[in-house]
Amino acid sequence: MDTNNKYLKKETVSNYSSRNANHYDDPMNKNFVYGEMTVNFVNQLNFEDKDNVVADIGCGTGFAYDILYEKIKDDKRKFIGVEPAKGMLDLAVEKFKSNENFSFQEGTFAKIPLEDNSVDKIISTLALHWVPSLDDSIKELKRVLKPNGSIDIMMTAKDDGEGFKKPIIVAMQKHLNFKQIMKASALSQRVSPTHIQNYFSKEFDLENDYTLNVDNIKKIIYGNFEEHMKWWKARSEQIISEVENKDQFMNDLKESLKTIETDQGIPFDLSILHIKLKRKK
């Protein structure tokens, strides 16, 4: 991807994430589709005694720290959030302003505003797939991570929502040209567990120094149109940023999604990657 395309992708994702910041804290989004998966992922995180500095990269509104708060609020650890979208960053700062152990800074995966070898544990939920370059991002993770540090990341997999996206593309074809659709589809990284292994192996010695586990979790989530649109608008509106008549698009999308609806509702074929990197003992 060339420099101009990287910049456009970064700006598109950041701008629309910022604009939709309030939707991310909607109770529906915390308990439906990606929300449920995120809660499960975060609750399984394990903090060791050595993990004095924890950084959530692409922290959004601080959702992961929300989930963990009762367990970590009195910890002596330092919890840092890094987020490119100002709207989300502002919400995170406001929510955690009463606890001095939490701090938030503007930044991206490719430009983390932290010193070399300064973080014991890096976490991230549903953010890494939005980066312009996985190579640049993983190189930066390696830079800020302490040599004995660990990484826990949750991101969408290559086939996430594959069936759900087909009627979306049908609706998009009524409003966007081929070039615009291809541009929208390129906003998100589409990677498999094998891809992740290859990317991380460029920066981390997986043969001698680190272990990397990549699990692919799949689940079908059923809901009605309104339920799906709650989370889809919050997480995917940047994909239709160039649609001029968004009301008509939503009407067309509603009709298009009826083609995959079942007695249980409209299915979303969720496919998530859980990435865990640890130093070998």
Regions flagged by a language model, labelled:
Residues E203-F204, S271-K281:
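Core SAM-dependent methyltransferase catalytic element
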Residues D135, S150-I220, I239:
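Conserved catalytic/acceptor-binding region of the Class I
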Residues A110-K121:
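A short acidic, Gly/Pro-enriched loop at the edge of an enzyme's catalytic core
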Residues V13, R19-H23, Y210-Q264:
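C-terminal helical/coil "lid" or tail adjacent to the Rossmann-like core of SAM-dependent
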Residues M1-D51, F63-K71, M88-L91, K95:
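Conserved class I S-adenosyl-L-methionine
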Residues V53, G149-S150:
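Short glycine-centered segments of the SAM/dcSAM-binding site in methyltransferase folds
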Residues V53-K111:
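Class I SAM-dependent methyltransferase SAM/SAH-binding core
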Residues K121-L134, A157:
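A short SAM/SAH-binding and catalytic strip from SAM-dependent methyltransferases
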